[in-house]
A protein has these predicted regions:
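GST-like domain detector, emphasizing the conserved glutathione-binding G-site
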Residues: 1-128
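Internal catalytic-core helix/loop-beta-alpha segment
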Residues: 127-142
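Conserved small/polar residues in nucleotide/adenosyl-binding loops
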Residues: 146-150
Length: 150
């Protein structure tokens, strides 16, 4: 059985999606971010990074796998039954989109999230300035998300 250590507002949603697509049975252990938007200490008990996504595979000796790309590869390798493996002709496309999602797309999404949360974390009298700057940055990031890769 795969146990997904699911942290709200994390990349673990993509793991749930892959599990559903591959029809792999799983359980979810839910974790909530604290008021500081950080993962709880309990996630460090599962894996030293203390972040999500992380899975535990109870069918393979309680193997713990962290990082979304590694988890997806693991699930395809051990549970995909040939599904999720690109054909020889599509391997290059698969490599590109995998690298793009991690190296180009995710940094912009993380910055977008930071600029959405930042105004809520500062004193009220600074919020209007941060909102003004943040709105410009958000517009730029959204534009980049729509036009990349180009």
């Amino acid at each position: 059985m795969i146990i997904v250590h699911h942290l709200n507002n994390s990349r673990s949603q993509r793991i749930l999606w892959v599990l559903e697509e591959l029809e792999i049975p799983y359980e979810i252990k839910f974790y909530q971010r604290g008021a500081d938007h950080r993962a709880p200490k309990e996630l460090r008990d599962v894996h030293p990074l203390g972040k999500s996504p992380v899975i535990t595979d109870t069918d393979r000796g309680n193997k713990v796998v962290a990082e979304s790309g590694a988890i997806i590869n693991y699930l395809i390798k051990y549970y995909g039954n040939g599904r999720g493996v690109p054909t020889k002709e599509r391997e290059d496309d698969n490599d590109f989109w995998t690298q793009f999602s991690e190296a180009s797309l995710m940094p912009n999404l993380v910055l977008l999230l930071i600029f959405m949360l930042l105004p809520t974390q500062v004193p009220f009298f600074i919020r209007p300035i941060l909102n003004m700057v943040g709105n410009q940055v958000r517009r730029l990031l959204i534009c980049l998300l729509y036009t990349s890769p180009s």
